[in-house]
Amino acid sequence: MIKKEFKAESKRLLDLMINSIYTHKEIFLRELISNSSDAIDKIYYKALTDESMIFNKEDYYIKITTDKENKMLIISDMGIGMTKEELEENLGVIAQSGSFTFKKENEIKDGFDIIGQFGVGFYSAFMVADSVTVISKALGSDQGYKWESIGAEGYTIEPYEKESVGTEIILKLKENTEDEKYEDYLEAYRLKTIIKKYSDFIRYPIKMDIETSKPKEGAEGEYEEIVEEQVVNSMVPMWRRNKNELTKEDYDLFYSEKHYGFDKPLKHIHISADGAVRYNAILFIPEKIPYDFYTKEYEKGLELYSSGVLIMNKCSDLLPDYFSFVKGMVDSEDLSLNISREMLQHDRQLKIIAKKIKEKIKSELELLLKNERERYEEFYDSFGRQIKYGVYSDFGQNKETLKDLLLFYSSKEKKMVTLDEYVGRMKEDQKYIYYASGDSIEKIDKMPQTELLAEQGYEILYFADDVDEFAIRVLVDYKEKEFKSVSSGDLGIEEKDEKEEQEEQTQGSKEVFAFMKEALSQKVKDVRPSKRLKNHPVCLATDGDVTIEMEKILSAMPNNQEIKAERVLEININHDVFKTLKEAFDNDQEKLKIYTNVLYNQALLIEGLTINDPVEFTNDICKLMS
């Protein structure tokens, strides 16, 4: 027996793999199981091309056994095995893949998948083991061999009597440290958890001897401990099954088992795609918003599998931010992985899959909106805010994709409507899509600024979410109809005779408004007669792009930029209050100053804004009452 050195920068490369390539030590088991699956696949492929061979899938499995006394973990398979030369070539050269060579030599193309494309997964065993022993007998060979190594120093190969074809890997686990309990890898529960997480859908049975209890024969009420062999993996991924054979209960159970949420999914989307990139996916739209959805702890992304082996728990690149609420998984045989099998080597395939998934989610939401309106509104109640974020984020580049998924409360319908529904029933001469912003539907419904539009039968969209107005500012228009706030200076509905009448009424009142503007100093841009008020005496309007509601939202942000709306105090000249203002202007201008401040503060309160000096406000009211 001669000790040999590794051929590929030995210590440096092995140290790099053990310490840098893999994120979690538990991944070693995934790699070794994947190698065992590859070995059985090779027998299957040979049987396809060799009529003298019979391959019965039920006869092949992978076995995990433990020896707690000697701290050994054994992974064995009934695969194709390795000759002495193959042991030296595949295990003696780091980054030499036997699966890759086999695939190349046999010209295996589409339709047959071998998981291992690199030759480094085996060496992940050294993350948890002081020494690794491989006992293997190749198909068609009379002699078995034993390969042993304690790490970067090298390895030995010697003949070994092995009865059956296949490979056995024996890991002598490391001693426990403060940071890692290596003996946990000898516990059945820990091993089953790792297998379920990463290798549940390996296509061959993974068997373990599990200790369990059963009623003792002839002794009522007594139990005895027995050890029985159990299959611990599912083998057949749900996403590869025929959709028509699956029920809603099947999908709900999968959602629960994968711990995607504590609720039930509102909708599932099952994709089986062939084309430039082949992939399967099962996606879920949750029924309720996750408790941590709007926190920094929330991670978006889908589980990513490569040929049934879990590669990433959360692949964020598969979902745009505006669909970050979607849960589920994607499995593809066409991904190019890096040597740790944990990350993508390049993302061309992933971008194709992500684009298709985005389009599918959108189309399914459109169908839900069209065919199951009530369920869509349930979804929108939970996740509509995220859709609106999607409209205005990234400089509006997604607004065309998302605009038809938006819903807003309608003053006329008293329910949620789409922009298309609103525009479809606009008056023939209507120039704008009207909206009103506020803290709640109830408060918006009472806004003085809506009086004129409501009286003339115009439909108003109510924006009660702080992101609404930002979204439509980015949207700009819908079907060539611009959005217009009910607080804007020009509502675009004034008739010529109305304009002449108002000008006539206000001719003798200009001095009153000028005095009031002076009294309010820098608080408002202007004081003017209102064209929109019918019953209320006063309201705030705005000139410019920033509305009162936008000012409130921006001022509440951490990086308060002191962005202010150009406030205009509007007075209803047909209200009795205006007569009082005119009388005060003619007879007691000090009282007019008090009236002006009271009306301005009243307008602030209606808008939900803070009064700068509440004490002065209450004193003014008392003065007027005394």
UniProtKB/Swiss-Prot annotation:
Q: Which domain of life is it from?
A: Bacteria
| Predominant place of localization | cytoplasm
Gene Ontology CC terms, in alphabetical order: cytoplasm
Identify the stretch(es) annotated as C: 553-626
Q: Which UniProt keywords apply?
A: ATP-binding, Chaperone, Cytoplasm, Nucleotide-binding, Stress response
Q: Where in the cell is it found?
A: Cytoplasm
The segments labelled B in the record are 342-552
Q: Identify the stretch(es) annotated as A.
A: 1-341
**Pfam families attached to this UniProt entry:** HATPase_c_3, HSP90
Q: Name one GO molecular function term.
A: ATP hydrolysis activity
Q: Which NCBIfam families does the annotation name? A: PRK05218.1
Protein family (similarity comment): Belongs to the heat shock protein 90 family.
Self-association state and partner proteins as the record states: Homodimer.
Function field: Molecular chaperone. Has ATPase activity.
Q: What HAMAP family does UniProt report for this protein, alphabetically?
A: HSP90
- Tell me the protein's name: Chaperone protein HtpG
